[in-house]
Amino acid sequence: RSTAVGGKGTEIAGVLLEKGIHVIQEHPVHYNDIVKLLKVAKENNCVYQVNSFYPNVKNVQEFIVKSNKLLKKSRPTYIDATCSTQALFPMISILGKALSGFHTWKLQTIDSVNSKFPFKVLSGEIRGIPAIVKIQNQLDPKDPDNNGFLLHRIVLGTTEGSLCLDNSNGLVIWNPQMYVPHAEGVLDMYGNNSYVELPV
């Protein structure tokens, strides 16, 4: 656990780097600590990296692969992403891999949200796609690993439907875009949507 969440992980990483031992540290790590540890690594001819971990989890990998395929066949319409404070860096990594990049982006805080709402809400665009990002901006310093409502929930909306990562260790859910043909006397909720034919 890093200094940012009350642990000694950053200190331990520094000692290892001073001995010339390569270090991969899981986020969250404070950016000042990252800069400091990169300098120590360079001075001792070794490597220091921060790992976002979650893009390597099976369900998250599935979401990333399916997002890449989906975006080759349809146009993105929105992103709705939610995470805990500890999982923000990995969420940026997940989004970057799902969208084949994160730049350019512009997000601003929405100040009109109910003050009791446990999430900080940001609105803007990621890669030109309208986006809402909600971050549970709460951390219990005595128990930083608990009290989070979720790790990640990401919905990628497209012209064909929405792909949802329910949680980092949850399900990947496909919801096809509803299409109602205008044929008199015929009620067909799906029409010719090719995504409805995909195996589940």
Feature map (PLM): residue ranges:
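Phosphate-binding glycine-rich loops and adjacent basic patches that engage nucleotide phosphates
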Residues: R1-A4, H22-V29, N51-Q61, V180-G191, ...
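Beta-loop-alpha module in the N-terminal Rossmann-like domain of NAD(P)-dependent dehydrogenases
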Residues: R1-V40
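C-terminal helix-rich "cap/oligomerization" subdomain common to oxidoreductases
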Residues: G14-V15, C46, V200
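Structured helix-beta-strand junction loops
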Residues: K19-G20, E43-N44, K73, G101, ...
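A contiguous active-site-proximal alpha/beta segment in oxidoreductase catalytic domains
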Residues: I24, H30-I94
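Contiguous beta-strand/loop segments that form the cofactor/metal-binding neighborhood of enzyme cores
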Residues: F89-L198
